Regions:
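Residue(s) in the substrate-gating loop at a strand-loop-helix junction
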Residues: 132
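Substrate-binding pocket helix/loop in short-chain dehydrogenase/reductase
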Residues: 88-89, 96-101, 205
Length: 247
């Protein structure tokens, strides 16, 4: 089984991991739809797209309907859209918590539910979430983000068993820090707050990775593509870490 001719939806597809994942699926012959919140960023990728805020369930359903009408039933969903904020737990507000849960957890649920009927009808499907090492361990000052990402792994493990006889597999990819524009902004934030050099700030973030490097977007994308291959047909309910041995 290959992804050639299969309809793949990648959320958060305008940049970083999502954009790289979409490109690698296109190169593998898939019919890809990317989704994101702003049209201009999506247009730049030169891949068919739908504007969609994954936290808005009605918008998700409409976007999937439009994508389905254009490119056929959905076979693969890479739920990649996400966000993180840093705040001490004592200052975590209910709204900040809700925001983290909405994009990082509810967004995954909304997208997977939108594609589930197609996958069940086909007797084959791949539900993939871009999670994080924060799905499996704690980090300071990102308690809401860690809680949401831990929940994604719980969702993944539950659905894997629920859907095990349908031909659908459900997995989460859990990378450490990935070298993206978002990471660059995080490094700049450390520099501005501490006066560190860019190199020193980068080393702080690399410290948990025994390989002392950042994960690259093609590693995450390649893992998603592998999960759609015959070689991974028994891989179900897993949280696959890409962290150089951190976890």
């Amino acid at each position: 089984m290959s992804v050639e001719g299969k309809h793949v939806i990648v959320t958060g597809g305008a940049s970083g991991v999502g954009a790289q994942t979409a490109r690698q699926f296109v190169e593998a012959g898939a019919d890809v739809t990317i989704m994101g919140r702003t049209e201009q960023s999506l247009v730049d990728q030169k891949i068919p797209y739908q504007v969609c805020d994954v936290t808005d369930r009605e918008m998700v359903m409409k976007a999937f309907d439009a994508a389905r009408a254009a490119r056929g039933p959905v076979a693969v969903v890479v739920a990649n859209a996400g966000a993180a904020t840093s705040v001490p737990f004592a200052r975590l507000t209910p709204k900040a918590l809700d925001d983290m849960l909405s994009v990082n957890l509810s967004g995954v649920i909304n997208c997977w539910q939108a594609a589930l009927p197609d996958m069940k009808s086909a007797g084959w499907g791949r539900m993939i979430a871009t999670a994080s090492t924060a799905s499996l361990r704690g980090y300071p000052y990102v308690s809401a983000y860690c809680a949401a990402k831990h929940a994604v792994v719980g969702l993944t493990r539950s659905l894997a068993r629920e859907l095990a006889l349908t031909g659908i597999t459900v997995n989460a990819i859990c990378p450490g820090y990935v070298e993206t524009p978002l990471l660059e902004r995080s490094i700049l934030n450390i520099v501005n707050k501490t006066g560190m050099s860019t190199d020193d700030a980068s080393k702080v973030l690399m410290a948990d990775n025994p390989q002392r490097r950042f994960v690259q977007t093609d590693e995450v994308a390649g893992t998603a593509l592998w999960l759609c291959s015959d070689a991974a047909r028994s891989v179900n309910g897993h949280a696959l870490t890409l962290s150089g041995g951190e976890i």
